[in-house]
Amino acid sequence: MDRYYYEYTVDIDAFKDEIESFLMDRFYNGIEESDGKLILRSEKSLDDIMDELRTYVDSLIKLFDTEIHLKITKEKKENIDWIEKYKKSITPVEVGEFYIHPSWYEPKEGKTNIKIDPALAFGSGHHETTRGCLNAIQKYVQPGMELLDVGCGSGILSIAAAKKGAVVDICDTDALALEESQKNFSLNGVEFREGWVGSAANAKKKYDIVIANIVADVLIMIAKDLQETTKEGGILILSGIIEKYRNKVKNRFDFSILEELQEGEWITMILRNDRGTDGK
């Protein structure tokens, strides 16, 4: 453990859900919320992520022609084992048949248990988008199906699918996510078939189920790739959609909507490829 760590505090007066989701897609060691501010801690510099955040906020200002006030503070602090302190705040969560728990909790009898590296809060099942995807996985994933997890993060969704008997491929634009997913797959005694740094555009085949739990803007940006990677009759699960962006996302996809799961402001959209095309 390093002697010092960096603490970043992100204070923003608008688009808070979007900003939190944006950061969760890029930082896997846990994000704390305190007094309406987001706090990220790391022994390595997160300056690059903060630069990306500033660029993202600038794009929101231009897109919505509005004012957004963003303040980022960075402090170097002595490391008094904040990781252990944070770990103790992580508790198990139950989503349908799945029971997601840190390593110091016992598995739950009668449930599909998923053990997550306790240093990882993102993708622990506590966020509404993760829970929506887990409910969709429980309903639609069958043994032997081929599934692609786009933006795999900590790997919790693809681990859940693998535990249901799916053949799983994973991808993420962040190489760290692939490393963390590998750790969690090993922790759970399951495997993914193939993983790559990149997105759906790099897929070499089509899948029975494609899952993308990412921010709405990115879903819209890669909509064509997500659809082209889904087999005829296949299922596309989209999450990370705030209610006010529902129609914007919906209009970008021409698959039929099977159902929508909503928790709070967050929507998980389940689509089916009824376009009558197959083959790549």
From Swiss-Prot:
It is an enzyme of class 2 (transferase). It catalyses: L-lysyl-[protein] + 3 S-adenosyl-L-methionine = N(6),N(6),N(6)-trimethyl-L-lysyl-[protein] + 3 S-adenosyl-L-homocysteine + 3 H(+). GO terms for cellular component: cytoplasm. Gene3D superfamilies: Vaccinia Virus protein VP39. Its EC number is 2.1.1.-. One of its GO terms (biological process) is methylation. It comes from the Bacteria. GO terms for molecular function: protein-lysine N-methyltransferase activity. InterPro entries: Ribosomal_L11_MeTrfase_PrmA, Ribosomal_PrmA_MeTrfase, SAM-dependent_MTases_sf. Keywords: Cytoplasm, Methyltransferase, S-adenosyl-L-methionine, Transferase. CDD domains: AdoMet_MTases. S-adenosyl-L-methionine binds at residues 130, 151, 172, 213. It is found in: Cytoplasm. Pfam families: PrmA (PF06325). NCBIfam families: PRK00517.2-4, prmA. Methylates ribosomal protein L11. Belongs to the methyltransferase superfamily. PrmA family. HAMAP family: Methyltr_PrmA. This is Ribosomal protein L11 methyltransferase. It comes from Nitratiruptor sp. (strain SB155-2).
